[in-house]
């Protein structure tokens, strides 16, 4: 019984450490790439993605942290 309680306590402590580490990770600033971590832009920013084309051929998707209330238009 003691072993079961000890194991449960260890699992709870490990879970809390992981959550705290996730909350402390650095956010991605304005106009930096967020393709691999779309939910990690700093406060007031959103991760917006675009499909990239080179000479009419799709070359993948790239995402950038941009301001939430700003809309960008192609030139």
Curated annotation (Swiss-Prot):
Source organism, top-level taxon: Eukaryota
Q: Which GO terms describe its cellular component?
A: extracellular region
Kindly list the places in or outside the cell where this protein is found, as annotated in its UniProt entry. Secreted
- Tissue specificity comment: Expressed by the venom gland.
Tell me the keywords, alphabetical order: Disulfide bond, Secreted, Signal, Toxin
* UniProt GO molecular function: toxin activity
Regarding how it is modified after translation, the entry says: Contains 4 disulfide bonds.
Membrane-crossing residue ranges in chain numbering: none
Q: Where is the signal peptide?
A: 1-21
Proregion residues are 22-25
The family note in this entry says: Belongs to the neurotoxin 19 (CSTX) family. 06 (U6-Lctx) subfamily.
* Full protein name: U6-lycotoxin-Ls1a
């Amino acid at each position: 019984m003691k072993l079961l309680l000890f194991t449960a306590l260890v699992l709870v402590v490990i879970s809390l450490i992981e959550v705290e580490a996730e909350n402390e990770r650095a956010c991605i600033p304005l106009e930096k790439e967020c393709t691999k971590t779309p939910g990690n832009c700093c406060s007031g920013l959103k991760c917006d993605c675009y499909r990239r084309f080179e000479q009419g051929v799709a070359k993948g998707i790239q995402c950038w942290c941009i301001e939430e209330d700003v809309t960008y238009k192609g030139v």
